[in-house]
Design a protein with these regions (language model features):
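Short, surface-exposed "cap/lid" segments of acyl-processing enzymes
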Residues: 1-62
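A short beta-to-alpha transition loop/helix N-cap that caps and shapes the active-site region
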Residues: 36-40, 148-159
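Alpha/beta-hydrolase active-site loop
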Residues: 46-104
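Gly/Ala-rich beta-loop-alpha elbow adjacent to hydrolase catalytic centers
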Residues: 113-122
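A conserved short beta-strand
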Residues: 132-154
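Alpha/beta-hydrolase
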Residues: 153-328, 332-336
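Catalytic active-site module of serine/aspartate enzymes centered on a nucleophile-bearing elbow/loop
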Residues: 303-320, 326, 349-392
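Conserved loop-alpha-helix segment in the C-terminal half of the alpha/beta-hydrolase fold
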Residues: 328-357
Length: 392
């Protein structure tokens, strides 16, 4: 299950590594229903080599400063997708229940994992009440990658009511970059990552575009690969984008346009693969429902609380988790993720042997686990034995 503003493709690097190392396993990645609102028409053409870098840039971004560009991307208006204000945890869990059901039909073990907000969604699923039955009854394990939900201080019912009322008059979608264009973060990342793969050494078109955020711009004109790496690296990316940061590298010492030098645990190419797309799918969510993030504040490790009724959250089987739990913490989730996993295990009476905790808060950024090189990736090195034990 992807995290905030994330799409199915960003599990691609780890998925390929896992199925190569663990014969018999499949990795299914969820593209939530909000991803169906995205317009991949020209981006798909670029990936297929049928559109140029300039054409794809103009279609999605260039038209904002050049009214002569037509046809161009048009985002749905808030009014036209007003129904998305209801796309919260209940909707996401209902959709995920269908996916888990299909996986169970194969007859093997089913392990549910999630990164970031996806970890909270995975926790919600495992503790969800499906007509008196716990969601964990469908599962053989739980993998929480720098995201989870533990019991403690859920949102109050009054605060939940206030947030719901505010959402009714604001955009249904998260504006991660703050440009008043909720889709822009997804488009920037999808285009930047795809250009880093398709035209890595060409000059970045975004760099000289007048609306490109200054916080993302290197001090010199970069290649596509360098622009992408610079924007997402922990040393140079803005703090506001900590959700997508990795230890990638740095600008090359020379060159015009300036290239990129890998010197971190995550090569820039693997980082780009995580966010670039295949046909119709990329590693971002251009339209992340604010209701989904709001609802996560009431999951509370599956312990019922007054906000549940306000937000239509049904995670109430927090003491019925009798499946192995794995948790991996980076600098963003930090001790909170490990504490949440520990609390989940404790409240269900899970034996210590059923809990695997991996603390890399001092060395891993939030997205390093999903894209770090396999030979350096401590997530892969520790989750693979966890999965092997479940299968045996």
């Amino acid at each position: 299950e992807p995290g905030t503003s994330a799409g199915a493709a960003y599990f691609r690097p780890d998925s390929e590594a896992i199925v190569a190392r663990l014969p018999g396993w499949q990795v299914w990645s969820v593209d939530r229903r909000e991803n169906a609102l995205e317009d991949h028409s020209v981006l798909d053409g670029y990936i297929a080599g049928k559109r140029t870098q300039q054409q794809v840039f103009d279609y999605y971004l260039g038209w904002l400063t050049d009214p002569k560009i037509s046809p161009h991307f048009t985002a749905p208006t808030d009014l036209s997708v007003d129904f998305t204000r209801q796309w919260g945890m209940d909707v996401a869990i209902g959709d995920l229940h269908q996916v888990v059901g299909q996986a169970k039909k194969l007859g093997g073990k089913v392990v549910l994992g999630g990164h970031s907000l996806g970890g909270a969604i995975a926790t919600a699923y495992a503790t969800w009440d499906f007509n008196g039955k716990s969601g964990s009854d469908d599962l053989d394990g739980l993998v929480l990658i720098d995201g989870a939900s533990g019991p403690g201080s859920p949102i109050t019912a009054s605060d939940a009511n206030a947030r719901v009322q505010k959402l009714a008059t604001s955009s249904p979608f998260l504006d991660l970059v703050g440009l008043g264009l909720p889709w822009s973060a997804g488009v920037f990342t999808a285009l930047g990552s795809t250009a880093a793969l398709s035209s890595p050494d060409a000059a970045s078109l975004a760099y000289n575009w007048k609306l490109f955020p200054a916080m993302l711009k290197p001090p010199v004109e970069p290649t596509n690969k360098a622009q992408f790496g610079y924007a997402l690296d922990t040393k140079t990316g803005p703090a506001s984008l900590e959700l997508v940061q990795m230890h990638i590298g740095e600008l090359a010492p020379s060159g015009a346009p300036r290239g990129w030098k890998d010197d971190g645990i995550t090569p820039v190419q693997r980082a780009a693969v995580a966010f670039a797309g295949i046909e119709g799918v990329d590693g971002t969510a251009w339209y992340h429902p604010q209701k989904l993030s709001l609802d996560s504040s009431a999951v509370n490790g599956g312990i019922a609380n007054p906000a549940d009724a306000v937000l239509d959250v049904h995670a109430t089987h927090g003491k019925d988790l009798h499946i192995p739990i794995y948790a991996f913490a980076t600098s963003l989730g930090n001790q909170r993720v490990l504490d949440a996993a520990t609390a989940l295990a404790k409240q269900s009476g899970l034996a210590s042997s059923g809990l695997t905790l991996v603390d890399r808060a001092s060395t891993y950024a939030h997205c390093d686990p999903i894209a770090a090189a396999p030979d350096k990736n401590d997530f892969l090195k520790t989750v693979e034995p966890f999965l092997h034990n479940i299968a045996s």
